[in-house]
Amino acid sequence: MGVSKLDILYRRLLLTKLFIRGWGRPEDLKRLFEFRKMIGNRERCQNLVSSDYPVHIDKVEEQSDCKILDGHFVSPMAHYVPGIMPIESVIARFQFIVPKEWNSRYRPVCIHLAGTGDHHYWRRRTLMARPMIKEARMASLLLENPYYILLKPKDQVRSSLKNVSDLFVMGGALILESAALLHWLEREGYGPLGMTGISMGGHMASLAVSNWPKPMPLIPCLSWSTASGVFTTGVLSKSINWRELEKQYYTQTVYEEEIIHMLEYCGTDSFKMGHEFMKHFPSNEDKLTNLNLVSRTLNLDMRDQVVSPKHAECHHSGKASISATSKGQLLQDTAKVERLNQTLTTNKSCFASYNPQSLHLLSREQRRSNLQKESLIFMKGVMDECTHVANFSVPVDPSLIIVVQAKEDAYIPRTGVRSLQEIWPGCEIRYLEGGHISAYLFKQGLFRQAIYDAFERFLHKYAN
């Protein structure tokens, strides 16, 4: 399946750059990776936010068909990783849109997390929450993203996060903030409760639901299993300040000497395939301009991933096991298996062979090429560590998950990435024609229908 030309054109029209200041402070990355281990385990994470966590309502506005409540609370992230959030983001803000009348004895609420660039509430309120009031008498709670609008650092331009680490701070904050709001909604007598989001919002909703200890409808729209492809092979990768990332990776050895060793994710689409990437990346490539080339060099053109028994041991208990298809493939193609096993069982020390101290002996073109390779692999590694859903608990009931994905999405690559159906057995995936932008503009009705279907599925299965 090809990619949407509209997605590519739309990205070219946007001039903003991502991660203009680089990776973020190494000490911040270390703290975030340690925190990821905590929130990646539901048994540990579910106790981080108490059931009586304080939430405050600031304003109530009565309208003809609904009430609109604005509220705030202190982000729990500020308690667990103090000092890592910008001061502007410490106070989380939300808007709660409640129908004047309900269709039944239930009072369903869906939390909507924001996608990239979705500042404030008006877009989600207009395109999703208002129609949901009219169509299904369903309430919507819109949580503002950290780093957006009132929560945006003063020196940040629009949605352009300054550091790679900012994305991980945002994700950790949204997981804990969602838990605080879910507890509050339960205290107020609402239910059933579910979560959704479009693009980045869908991915953040997936991570939040993975840590909720009860069955919950989840409807991630235009998102997939990891953000690593978004920032290495998707069209957004063209907006990244790679020069600064490469420079920092070269000048600060802490990234390869310490931080790489903290990366634990080892699925079949792991960054440990980087050894194969090193072998095949063309030495004369000066810019990351060909996304298909990047996909090939990251081994993303392999339709069926296989994994060695030794590698399978690195999965945490509860992760999806190797499929029968993969086992069959293992027997069919010995040469391919040997090459992959060598790649997949290579430990993190493979990066140490590319010592920045020795790069001065190479030609300028070779140094540039090697830095590109290592920076791209490191980006995949840190993104998989903090965003891959396989690094988090499986939601309590995957049958309540309906994923809506665009077939030609150039923002969210699926090639070479583990399928959500493999990670969440029993979930449903609905594919739409077209790409990311066209789906966002014209398929909101299908997103809402998926929400209604998931909530109906919950009531059919769990209603008293």
Swiss-Prot record:
Pfam families per the UniProt record, alphabetical: ABHD18
Domain of life assignment: Eukaryota
GO cellular component, one term: extracellular region
Compartments (UniProt record): Secreted
Gene3D superfamilies from the UniProt entry: alpha/beta hydrolase (3.40.50.1820)
Transmembrane segments: none
Predominant localisation class: secreted
Keyword vocabulary terms for this entry: Glycoprotein, Secreted, Signal
Range of residues in the leader sequence: 1-24
Disulfide pairings: none
Glycosylation sites noted in the Swiss-Prot or TrEMBL record: 341
Family: Belongs to the AB hydrolase superfamily.
PANTHER family for this protein: PROTEIN ABHD18
The name this protein goes by in its record: Protein ABHD18
Organism: Rattus norvegicus (Rat)
